[in-house]
Amino acid sequence: MHKYRTHNCNELQISDVRKEVKLSGWVHRRRDHGNLVFIDLRDHYGITQIVFTDQNQQLMEDASRLRYESVITVRGTIVARSNDTINDTLPTGHIEVLAGEFIVESAADTLPFVINTEKDAPEETRLKHRFLDLRREKLHNNIILRSQIISHIRHLMTGRGFTEFQTPILTASSPEGARDFLVPSRMHPGKFYALPQAPQQFKQLLMVSGFDRYFQIAPCFRDEDARADRSPGEFYQLDVEMSFVTQEDIFSTIEPVMYDLFTKFTAKKVSETPFVRIPYNESMLKYGSDKPDLRNPIIIADVTEIFRDSDFTIFRENIKKGSIVRAIPAPKAAALPRSFFDKMIEFAISEGAGGLGYIQFSETGEAKGPVAKFLSPQQLESLKATASISNGDAVFFASDKKEKAAKLAGKVRIRLGEELDLLEKDCFKFCWITDFPFYELNEDTGKIDFSHNPFSMPQGGLEALEQAKTTEELLELTAYQYDIVCNGIELSSGAIRNHKPEIMYKAFSMAGYSEEEVDKRFGGMIRAFKFGAPPHGGIAPGIDRIVMLLAEATNIREIIAFPLNQQAEDLLMNAPSYVEDKALKELSIMLSPSILKNMK
């Protein structure tokens, strides 16, 4: 018989009765009944009930003293449970093991929190004792699910003719939109490597190298703040690149992968392929966001022209100054109490707005509310037609400069969807957002900057760049840039790449980069493009966000084995930490006086 186990804790059945077995695992629960002691023994696979009787008094007493989470090996005989003790919630619930002997492999100290319930302990305690936290059923299953998802992704990608690669972790800095993690070079004092924010340049270089279909489960490193759906430090993405492809080729390749993944790992309804395509400008108008949650049926409408000549002075004067007005319908909300509308106004103010106008249309069509009296009957009918408002509905208004009004309307739409319980249940709704702006204005400098990936191909190519003479014209340029969105969560950005050096130099020059700067920062890729580069494009869906959705987790730390906390600290391994002076000297690093003072 094996030293530790003949079976795992999830496989013994009624057909195994009278077999002598050996099991090993953790003491999950212990119940003392005087002349009986029951222990639920847990391993990676499941739980089996062990019973100790007073026929072996010493063994039973020893078992009664076992602490939760101690590791034991039990030898015993399988017996059938009585009908009144059968537990159909467990695969092993029809049997139990009558213990003949047990060995304590490792005794557990007093636990800092309870393992055998899903009651949450303080996150700091959980992360400091992550090895215990990972024993809890929900988190343990999330990590298993993550492994299964990644394994299936590899199967799907190789089955579609993709080759898996590993690209360098120590590389050069690149402008991906976040701060780099820098690694000092011992051999080259004063110089630094950067951990890759994404394998962007390497995967494009592989296309130039003649490979056709690349993928990688790629670790990415960005020094950015934590969010519920973003872990500080590192994350993983399904990095994909393809040669000789159009935007639609990328879509038709990735859609079946997403559909297969989501239908395999959930019973919820999943959008049929092809997924809906929504141009960026349309998405910002209808949903007030470039990552719309299509489970929400509310569609925003532009009603600027209706208010341009209205008697509502505030909106009319705002429109004269270049503002717009967006209408956000609230289905079947007209009869709700005043407190609902006051709460929506308070929400808008908390989001930085001056307020939130609204109109209620009764079941008979009567218009009420603070804005209604300023519109003529014809304007009210036009409003109902434009915003698809029916009797019994209410409608809210957001007025500001175009971008601010769109974002406020989008937030109000989301809030209304939640407050009115409008979101379609038990489904995953996918869409593509296309035709992103190529450039944007940097909020800090007021200068032109790339809105997304600087390596995207501008629609219209070099000619479009040369014809754009003003800032306004540059901001109107669009890119072959796209996002895939599911239930309001951006899973990935992607693009058809700019593979022509002359277009790349021109695109960067518009953002204030000289040719020398471009050569210095992206010399390897520019040089490669001068030796025959295929048209290519790619995408990189986030593994962590996919797992979050499929695990129905609300926090990204619930699907990562060893995450950092919100302050980017590893409480288990005590990282980041100070290092010895010798190590700093080898790297030619000297700490500032203020840091040295804090160390003391």
From Swiss-Prot:
It comes from the Bacteria. GO terms for cellular component: cytoplasm. The record marks 33 as: Important for tRNA non-discrimination. The gene is aspS. Homodimer. Its main location: cytoplasm. Aspartyl-tRNA synthetase with relaxed tRNA specificity since it is able to aspartylate not only its cognate tRNA(Asp) but also tRNA(Asn). Reaction proceeds in two steps: L-aspartate is first activated by ATP to form Asp-AMP and then transferred to the acceptor end of tRNA(Asp/Asn). GO terms for molecular function: aspartate-tRNA ligase activity; aspartate-tRNA(Asn) ligase activity; ATP binding; nucleic acid binding. Its EC number is 6.1.1.23. Belongs to the class-II aminoacyl-tRNA synthetase family. Type 1 subfamily. L-aspartate binds at residues 176, 222, 452, 497. This is Aspartate--tRNA(Asp/Asn) ligase. ATP binds at residues 222-224, 490, 542-545. It is found in: Cytoplasm. It is an enzyme of class 6 (ligase). SUPFAM superfamilies: Class II aaRS and biotin synthetases, GAD domain-like, Nucleic acid-binding proteins.
